[in-house]
Swiss-Prot record:
Active site: D8, D128
Primary location class: cytoplasm
UniProt cross-references to HAMAP family, sorted A to Z: HisA
The organism of origin for this protein: Opitutus terrae (strain DSM 11246 / JCM 15787 / PB90-1)
Protein's pathway: Amino-acid biosynthesis; L-histidine biosynthesis; L-histidine from 5-phospho-alpha-D-ribose 1-diphosphate: step 4/9
Record CDD domains: HisA
Stated name of the protein: 1-(5-phosphoribosyl)-5-[(5-phosphoribosylamino)methylideneamino] imidazole-4-carboxamide isomerase
Top-level taxon in the UniProt lineage: Bacteria
Length: 243
């Protein structure tokens, strides 16, 4: 199981939001690339980067910061405002290893299919769940679509990786929604990366146990717990490598 430490960028800075609310923002670092260097020093191969301004605006707003993170030498999984093919191509041209589609994936299966045909496993889809429905446009709106229905559609299109975020637990440090993660893993063959709620080492232990039952549970994104020093990245990486 892969650990993906998270960097959320807003106004060029590293921040965390609570349940995606722009007004509940905590600034953790002025330079996101410095944070990426710390993650790399701890032994992380991957970093999960979200352009929050891009998610709200509908197109990436912090590509210079993303490029600086790529230059650190990590594999970057990047999302936030990638709603056109041109935006996806710009991100990949920066050296991003995997892009995450969100809003547009819920709106257009043909768009996803076209990108999967062109870029293969560099395309991931973020499935952001709010009470079982898909949240879109920076989580400020909800589509009339269940998360499991969208997941199955993406699986059928050949999307290699699904990133499943439970918004109710995101940034709350209350523990992940294991039942929701298990339900999604059971519904698809795609790799699943769990996101939302990790607050302590045992949360990752429990996800690793879930991954033993569901081989497609491929990773977990850890954000606020790292910044609040509830967990140590090097410890989580060792735990994941042993599971």
């Amino acid at each position: 199981m892969t650990i993906y430490p998270a960097i959320d960028i807003k106004g060029g800075r590293c921040v965390r939001l609570t349940q995606g609310r722009a007004e509940q923002e905590t600034i953790y670092a002025q330079n996101p690339a410095d944070v990426a260097m710390q993650f790399r020093a701890a032994g992380s191969e991957w970093v999960h980067v979200v352009d929050l301004d891009g998610a709200f605006a509908g197109e990436p707003q912090n590509l210079a910061a993303v490029q600086a993170i790529v230059a650190v030498g990590m594999k970057v999984q990047f999302g936030g405002g990638l709603r056109t093919r041109a935006a996806v191509e710009r991100a990949l041209a920066l050296g991003v290893s995997r892009v995450v589609l969100g809003t547009r994936a819920a709106e257009s299966e043909s768009f996803v299919g076209e990108l999967v045909q062109a870029f293969g496993d560099k395309i991931a889809v973020g499935i952001d769940a709010k009470n079982g429905k898909v949240a879109v446009k920076g989580w400020v709106a909800t589509a009339d679509l269940s998360t499991l229905v969208l997941a199955r559609r993406m699986d059928t299109l050949g999307v290699a990786t699904l990133i499943h975020t439970d918004i109710g637990t995101d940034g709350m440090l209350t523990g992940p929604n294991l039942a929701a993660q298990e339900a999604l893993c059971s519904a698809v063959k795609s790799r699943v990366i769990a996101s939302g709620g990790v607050s302590r080492r045992d949360d990752v232990v429990n996800l690793a146990k879930l991954a033993q039952r569901h081989a497609n549970l491929d990773g977990v994104i850890v954000g606020k717990a790292l910044y609040e020093r509830r967990v140590e990245l090097a410890d989580l990486l060792s735990l994941a490598a042993a599971s």
